[in-house]
Amino acid sequence: MSGTILENLSGRKLSILVGSLLLCQVLCFLLGGLYAPVPAGHTNVLGSLCRENHARQNDTSFFLYSRGEGSCTQVTREEVEQDSMKLANQIVHVFQMPLPRDSRVLDYSRWQQNLIGVLQVEFGYDSSSELREPPKELQLTIDMRLAYRNKGDPDHAWKLYAHGVEHRYLDCVAAHIGSSETLYTCDMIPLFELGALHHSFYLLNLRFPLDTPKQMNLQFGHMHDLTLTAIHQNGGFTHVWLMLKTLLFPFVVGIMVWFWRRVHLLQRSPALLEYMLLYLGGALTFLNLPLEYLSLTIEMPYMLLLSDIRQGIFYAMLLSFWLVFAGEHMLIQDSSNKSTIRSRYWKHLSAVVVGCISLFVFDISERGVQLRNPFYSIWTTPLGAKVAMSFILLAGVSAAVYFLFLCYMISKVFKNIGDKRTSLPSMSQARRLHYEGLIYRFKFLMLATLLCAALTVTGFIMGQMAEGQWKWNDDVEIQLTSAFLTGVYGMWNIYIFALLILYAPSHKQWPTMHHSDETTQSNENIVASAASEEIEFSNLPSDSNPSEISSLTSFTRKVAFE
């Protein structure tokens, strides 16, 4: 058989290919580092106090807003302090987004993709109160109304986006103890999450109803400042991200078609590794598909969930591929039968599948529900927060364990090849030079695989922590840089692109000759290959299994059986 392109490509051509791919990798890092802004931005919005309109208090089509024609009657902090009841049930906390800048009205762009809101709460107790420390897991009931309007709409033309009465649990500490009151500040609480940023302006009305019969919000003194942190994806980063996807998508599709065409030209059924390469390329193509362009014209609140599903499919396929890739090159089998998922890898891949399904269930339990209720969050209850944190920690530990196991498998591959290499001195010079060249190329590819796996696992763990840092209580700050994101994304494409090229079947046709003449000619070709990088590796005559895709595999298995 003719083997793979990795085996038959000349040293100079292989160097040009590897150099070109490394240059593309550097460009991906520079694209994010020099041209893209940080992936996400945030704005802190201090809530305005508006006096409640009791006649329309239960009308969900009525909204109070602080800027523009027809704005609400605002209440000062002094008026609240002077009232004996602190204006209970008479105040609405209003957040109008985005904030103006330099007297210019700003609006959200659909390029910003999504919007997440978290709330910082401060409240006070009279110093005469016996309560000095608020109870832990303090339950707060909030009437939330989220509205929107678009550019060109009148200032009062707010339309309801979502409404709900939700519970949040606070963990607070005393920030200032004064002679008249004690001020408490609380950890940030998740408020809402929008999977699509389709409209120009958003308005949030928050009410904290006091109800004695229902024991609602009676444990609080009175509200002080409320600060909403609105987090969104930066539009400039989305431009760069979609440009990268648009450029990479046709290249991956083209190389997949080319690869599978070469496989089907062979007079054998595709090997397991060839099937896995095709599935991996398909998962990458699905990830590369720039569906985000549709969100610029169509409101797609499920885009965040869809992005998580696409990335989850890719992670599952990539992790599975690495196990099969390393396993196929460990080259230790009890028989020379063709490898299958069921016969060799079902235990390894079952663990990957179970882990990915668990993460999918966790994701759908939050973002799936948010399609109907954007105020829902699994982090809002103490039990839910512990479960969510446990999932994040478990995902990080599992990723680290997977990487260590992959390192173990690759170390066994190197050990096995080292053991088989002891048989090289007994071979002819031509055959020894041939296999030494193949082993060198193979080791380089395995080290590149290990580097790709390390960056992937690091990116996964940092991504999980960055997503949860606004929702947990620890003071942990994780910032994924644009250069890291575009670099890792480009690395996935370049790595899989290289594998599809290097593991594609080589269709070089070698002349048919008698055994003695064939061996002489083969020796001459290989010695010439060692002397000149222009001459390509040629296959040594062997009785290798026609199902093998690599003569290195054939060599090591042959030695193993002997």
From Swiss-Prot:
Residues 538-562 are annotated as: Disordered. Glycans are attached at N58. It comes from the Eukaryota. The keyword Transmembrane applies. Residues 539-556 have a biased composition (Polar residues). Keywords: Cell membrane, Cell projection, Developmental protein, Endoplasmic reticulum, Endosome, Glycoprotein, Golgi apparatus, Membrane, Postsynaptic cell membrane, Segmentation polarity protein, Synapse, Transmembrane, Transmembrane helix, Wnt signaling pathway. Its main location: membrane. Residues 35-239, 292-311, 366-386, 463-482 are lumenal. GO terms for biological process: imaginal disc-derived wing margin morphogenesis; intracellular protein transport; positive regulation of protein secretion; positive regulation of Wnt protein secretion; positive regulation of Wnt signaling pathway; regulation of intracellular protein transport; segment polarity determination; Wnt protein secretion. It is a multi-pass membrane protein. GO terms for cellular component: cell projection; endoplasmic reticulum membrane; endosome membrane; Golgi membrane; neuromuscular junction; plasma membrane; postsynaptic membrane; presynaptic membrane. Residues 1-13, 261-270, 333-344, 408-441, 504-562 are cytoplasmic. Belongs to the wntless family. A segment polarity gene required for wingless (wg)-dependent patterning processes, acting in both wg-sending cells and wg-target cells. In non-neuronal cells wls directs wg secretion. The wls traffic loop encompasses the Golgi, the cell surface, an endocytic compartment and a retrograde route leading back to the Golgi, and involves clathrin-mediated endocytosis and the retromer complex (a conserved protein complex consisting of Vps35 and Vps26). In neuronal cells (the larval motorneuron NMJ), the wg signal moves across the synapse via the release of wls-containing exosome-like vesicles. Interacts with wg; in the Golgi. Interacts with Vps35, a component of the retromer complex; wls stability is regulated by Vps35. This is Protein wntless. It comes from Drosophila pseudoobscura pseudoobscura (Fruit fly). The gene is wls.
